[in-house]
From Swiss-Prot:
PANTHER family: ADP-L-GLYCERO-D-MANNO-HEPTOSE-6-EPIMERASE, NUCLEOSIDE-DIPHOSPHATE-SUGAR EPIMERASE. It comes from Hydrogenovibrio crunogenus (strain DSM 25203 / XCL-2). The gene is hldD. This is ADP-L-glycero-D-manno-heptose-6-epimerase. It comes from the Bacteria. Catalyzes the interconversion between ADP-D-glycero-beta-D-manno-heptose and ADP-L-glycero-beta-D-manno-heptose via an epimerization at carbon 6 of the heptose.
Length: 323
């Protein structure tokens, strides 16, 4: 059995779908469907079982009631960078992750988990080393603390433990994320609504629309996760991004190019994000390449075109957008 926590979420559901494409249906999805609209992400997937997150946790504590597990993809987390309830964040992203990791270590189950580029704060260097890690928000801190916990354990681990610092992921099955959905998704919806495409104006030394991120298409994220499952001798903490940062304006340009229409409107940078916003990110993926992963990453133009084609072919998912 393969366990995917957060399996009805953005990255988790894409992993489930990719496992199905490999012929795997012996999948246990763990999630919290309080936001019931997330179900659409796994409606076209084949799984063996579903467990609520709290039920799954109780079975971990009891050390019973779970099947034999081949691998765990731990994608379940509170991923809202604007959430400032530190207790909630640490309970979900740190304590829960520790419990699951130790369950896996005790049974020598490969454990692949979601970290985040948010651990680096405002950079400007994005290398998997302590001196570059300065999170700007409690979400980034929760991910950083778990990475630190993993670092202490890795030398003694007798089974695979691999964490992936996701940079700016976009792609299918993210419509439930509301404000945390990607810029590509938001701009697509603005075009459909006949609105101008809104980007932040000048801020932090960057011209309007030129704040820059290492955008990574969901297919690439899934490919890396599955590669590590197939290479269980590889452990560590790895940046997961193309190492090719592009400005937000390139996203807008790709959306306009796909639709054949649209106009950019620059809006004032919001006060609530000042001091807690990454204006530039770019993965150094040397460790990922050194581990042996050699597939190319999608460019923004390539990824956005694929994504918007998927949205156009699956218009029903917009009915499940979180308001």
């Amino acid at each position: 059995m393969i366990v995917v926590t957060g399996g009805a979420g953005f990255i988790g559901s894409n992993i489930v779908k990719a496992l199905n494409a490999q012929g795997r249906t012996d999948i246990l999805v763990v999630d919290n469907l309080k936001n019931g609209k997330k179900f659409i992400n796994i409606a076209d997937c084949d799984i063996a079982d579903y467990l609520d997150k709290e039920d799954f946790q109780s079975r971990i504590f009891a050390e019973e009631g779970l099947p034999d597990i081949d691998c765990v993809f731990h994608e379940g987390a509170c991923s809202a960078t604007t959430e400032w309830d530190g207790k909630y964040m640490m309970d979900n992203n740190y304590e829960y992750s520790k419990d699951l990791l130790n369950y896996c270590l005790n049974r020598k189950i490969p454990f692949l988990y979601a970290s985040s580029a948010a651990v680096y704060g405002d950079g400007p260097t994005f290398i998997e080393e302590r001196q570059y890690e300065k999170p700007l928000n409690v979400y980034g801190y929760s991910k950083f603390q778990f990475d630190q916990y993993v670092r202490r354990i890795l030398p003694l681990a007798e089974s695979q433990v691999a964490g992936f610092r996701y940079f700016n992921v976009y792609g299918p099955r993210e419509q439930h994320k509301g404000d945390m959905a990607s810029v590509a998704f938001k701009l697509h919806n603005q075009v459909l609504a006949g609105e101008k495409l809104k980007l932040f104006g000048a801020y932090d030394g960057y011209e309007a629309g030129m704040q820059t991120r290492d955008f990574v298409f969901i297919e690439d994220v899934v490919n890396v996760n599955l590669w590590f499952m197939e290479n269980p001798e590889q452990s560590g903490i790895f940046n997961l991004g193309p190492a090719a940062a592009e400005p937000f304006k390139h996203i807008a340009d790709a959306v306009i190019d796909f639709h054949g229409q649209g106009e950019i409107e620059y809006i004032p940078f919001p006060d609530r994000l000042k001091g807690a916003y990454q204006s530039f990110t770019q993965a150094d993926n040397t460790r990922l390449r050194d581990a042996g992963y050699d597939k190319p990453f999608h460019t923004v133009s390539e990824g956005v075109q694929k994504y918007l084609r998927w949205l156009s072919d699956n218009p029903r998912v917009l009915d499940f957008t979180k308001k």
